[in-house]
Structure formats: structure tokens, C-alpha cells
From Swiss-Prot:
Catalyzes the NADPH-dependent reduction of glutamyl-tRNA(Glu) to glutamate 1-semialdehyde (GSA). This is Glutamyl-tRNA reductase. The gene is hemA. It holds the Pfam family GlutR_N. NADP(+) binds at G189, A190, G191, E192, T193, I194. PANTHER family: GLUTAMYL-TRNA REDUCTASE (PTHR43013:SF1). Substrate binds at T49, C50, N51, R52, S109, E114, P115, Q116, Q120. It comes from Escherichia coli (strain SMS-3-5 / SECEC).
């Protein structure tokens, strides 16, 4: 059994590739079923966010393992293998465990130490448990990563300042507009990122917020909290002209805001500027919108420059966090090795018990037939001894023939010989 982590993220792939490799929530079960149908895959978790798509797997080791999994990923998303290979990373066993712990702790995030990723990892794990988690080692790896992430946040200052993609989006808005108290903001979506954006905007006393979402009920809960108006996605075209700032983050597979829609809004606004921040993957806003005069479009990747200013205060904490991850990875791998030994011990004990039961049954049968008890017991003891020491004896003889003193010493130690 081998643990794997493979995927792409904001550091290895542009948004144009990430959106093609992402797994939409409504097709996740189908993807997991397809993944587990691969003969070498024993269990799997798919983590797909705006900044990363990763597969965490428990697999049987084989020569073409990497090729087979890359082929599956490309076939599933209809990708050219060369396009993916240049951006794909591959971590195995110790490195896979360390990678997941770093991801869950926010150490591999676009915003160092951001807390949302832990919730996303937990959701990915929960989704995989709906009939897709078939490997206890993989499950234990995720549970351990959750506790490590909690330890990192408790024992370091990695989360001391409120820095996130949502915070960066609001920072961008405040840099462009001197005051948010005179602007109207349209939020598209009502997920966790938009919730954070809405709360940041409320803290900065934005004049008006409008929330457009596919389901009104979810949006209304957020709107009641932050004092916003709720509209349907179908109303965006008509209401877009009211918005000075548009921040969008949905799970839609297709763009929600098109170039023509923005052109009409700008015309109604008499070309008064609009800021559009698209933090969705796949993108919610057609890239061509950025070519329009007075439409200033920023994607997730564009937020990197803003976010970089907030990293300095977290770097010292990150060093501490990396130490924790290294320690916890080492402990987990020791547990994993012990599990492997436990399985060997169980097999060895089962084998010995089978020999014992077989020979005992024969001895009891001989006694029932009136055989000499002392002779039967001596025969049982002799046969049991020979059967149990047969395999170790052959190993000792082979080690001696090979001149392998190290193996001889290990065998002597394991047999309790001084």
C-alpha cells in the first residue's frame, strides 16, 4: 500500500488550466466512482478549490502507476497529457503525508496561513466517506492532518492577522475606492468566500450590498447578517449597472457575467468605472471583460501581488509550523510502519495457530482411537516444534550461505537468541 498526493495548484498552474482540471460539486461522486474503479486505487479523496485540484490516494504500487493516474485525470477532463505534466506535482508516502498536513494548516495556500482551506479539506474528506473511503490508512492520514492544523493554529501565530483571498479582494476595493461608504457592491454567490467578503465589507461600512445567488434561501441568511439585498442570478443583467464593485465566487461551470452584459451596464452608468474581482475557478466573468474601457477585471491570480504584502508577519510563524508538520509527519510514518508490522504479526500468529490447531486435532483423534497418550503427546510436541521452526531455520541457513552477517544477527535477535 502506498499513499499518494498529486495535483496542481496556484503555484504550478495558471487559472486557465486550473479551471479545466477542477471537479464541480455535482459531479464529484461520479468522479470518485470513476477513480475508485481504477484497479490500483484502494481509496481516494478529491480536493478541488479555486486554487488547487488534488487527489489523495491509497494505491497498490506498480510500475505504471504514475502513467495510469495521469492518463485517468487527462481522460476524465479531456486534457492533453503534455499540458498537465508540466504543472503536475506528485508526492508519495512521507512526502504525501507532509503535503496534506501543510495544505490543511494553510502553509501551502495562496495566502499563507489562511483558515478556509481546513474547512475545504474537511469537506473533501467528508464527501469521500459517502462510499468512497476504503482505506483506513488514508482516513487516518486525514484525521491526523486535521489535528496537526489545529495544533499549528494553537501553538503559532500563523493566523494572527485576518488575511485571505476574501480579505485581499476587499483590500483591492479599498485601494481603488478611497471610501467604501459611497459605493454599491454586488456579490455573486453565497459560499464561504463570499460570506467572508461580505463581513469584511460590512466592517468597512459599504453603502449598499446586493447578493445574487442561485438559491435565495442561502443568500437570505447571509443578507440578514450583513444587511444586504438578495436577487436572483437572472437579475444580474438588469441590476449590474448599479454596482461599482462586483465580487464573484460561484461553482458555476460557465461564466455568469459576459462582455455584453458589462458593456450594457457601463453604457447605463455613462462609463463610470466598475471594479470586477473574479475569485471563482472556473471563472465567473468572461476574460474579455478586462479589455473594456472603464471595466477593471482582476482574477484570483491577480490578487497575488496584494497578498504578498501581508506575508512578512507570518513568516516566522510558518517556520514554527513547518517544524510541527515535520515532527507530526515523522510520528505518522512511524505509526504507518507499525501498522505494516502489525499485519505481518497477525499473519504470522494466524499461521502458527493454524499449525497448532491442525496438529492438536490429529493428536486428539489419535487419543480417541486408544493410542498411547505419552507417545501421542511426544509426537505432537516434536511435530509442532519442527513445523514452527522450519521457516526460521531455512532463513538462517540461507543467510549463512550468503555470508549475510547482518541478516543473521537480525534473525538471531528476532528469535530471542543471545
Amino acid at each position: 500500500m502506498t499513499l499518494l498526493a498529486l495535483g496542481i495548484n496556484h503555484k504550478t498552474a495558471p487559472v486557465s488550466l486550473r479551471e479545466r482540471v477542477s471537479f464541480s460539486p455535482d459531479k464529484l461522486d461520479q468522479a470518485l466512482d470513476s477513480l475508485l474503479a481504477q484497479p490500483m486505487v484502494q481509496g481516494g479523496v478529491v480536493l478541488s478549490t479555486c486554487n488547487r485540484t488534488e487527489l489523495y490516494l491509497s494505491v497498490e504500487e506498480r510500475d505504471d502507476l504514475q502513467e495510469a493516474l495521469i492518463r485517468w485525470l487527462c481522460d476524465y477532463h479531456n486534457l492533453n497529457e503534455d499540458d498537465l505534466r508540466n504543472s503536475l506535482y506528485w508526492h508519495q508516502d512521507n512526502d504525501a503525508v507532509s503535503h496534506l498536513m501543510r495544505v490543511a494548516s494553510g502553509l501551502d495556500s495562496l495566502v499563507l496561513g489562511e483558515p478556509q482551506i481546513l474547512g475545504q479539506v474537511k469537506k473533501a474528506f467528508a464527501d469521500s466517506q459517502k462510499g468512497h473511503m476504503k482505506a483506513s490508512e488514508l482516513e487516518r492520514m486525514f484525521q491526523k492532518s486535521f489535528s496537526v492544523a489545529k495544533r499549528v493554529r494553537t501553538e503559532t501565530d500563523i493566523g494572527a492577522s485576518a488575511v485571505s483571498v476574501a480579505f485581499a479582494a476587499c483590500t483591492l476595493a479599498r485601494q481603488i475606492f478611497e471610501s467604501l461608504s459611497t459605493v454599491t457592491v454586488l456579490l455573486v454567490g453565497a459560499g464561504e468566500t463570499i460570506e467572508l467578503v461580505a463581513r469584511h465589507l460590512r466592517e468597512h461600512k459599504v453603502q449598499k450590498m446586493i447578493i445574487a445567488n442561485r438559491t435565495r434561501e442561502r443568500a437570505q441568511i447571509l443578507a440578514d447578517e450583513v444587511g444586504a439585498e438578495v436577487i436572483a442570478l437572472s437579475d444580474i443583467d438588469e441590476r449590474l449597472r448599479e454596482a461599482d464593485i462586483i465580487i464573484s465566487s460561484t461553482a458555476s461551470p460557465l461564466p455568469i457575467i459576459g462582455k455584453g452584459m458589462v458593456e450594457r451596464a457601463l453604457k447605463s452608468r455613462r462609463n463610470q468605472p466598475m471594479l470586477l474581482v473574479d475569485i471563482a475557478v472556473p471563472r465567473d466573468v468572461e476574460p474579455e471583460v478586462g479589455k473594456l474601457a472603464n471595466a477593471y477585471l482582476y482574477s484570483v491570480d491577480d490578487l497575488q501581488s496584494i497578498i504578498s504584502h501581508n506575508l512578512a508577519q507570518r513568516k516566522a510563524a510558518a517556520v514554527e509550523a513547518e517544524t510541527i508538520v515535520a515532527q507530526e509527519t515523522s510520528e505518522f510514518m512511524a505509526w504507518l510502519r507499525a501498522q505494516s508490522a502489525s499485519e505481518t504479526i497477525r499473519e504470522y500468529r494466524s499461521q502458527a495457530e493454524h499449525v497448532r490447531d491442525e496438529l492438536t486435532a490429529k493428536a486428539l483423534a489419535a487419543l480417541e482411537q486408544g493410542g498411547d497418550a505419552q507417545a501421542i503427546m511426544q509426537d505432537l510436541a516434536w511435530k509442532l516444534t519442527n513445523r514452527l521452526i522450519h521457516a526460521p531455520t531455512k532463513s538462517l541457513q540461507q543467510a549463512a550461505r550468503d555470508g549475510d552477517n547482518e541478516r543473521l544477527n537480525i534473525l538471531r535477535d528476532s528469535l530471542g537468541l543471545e
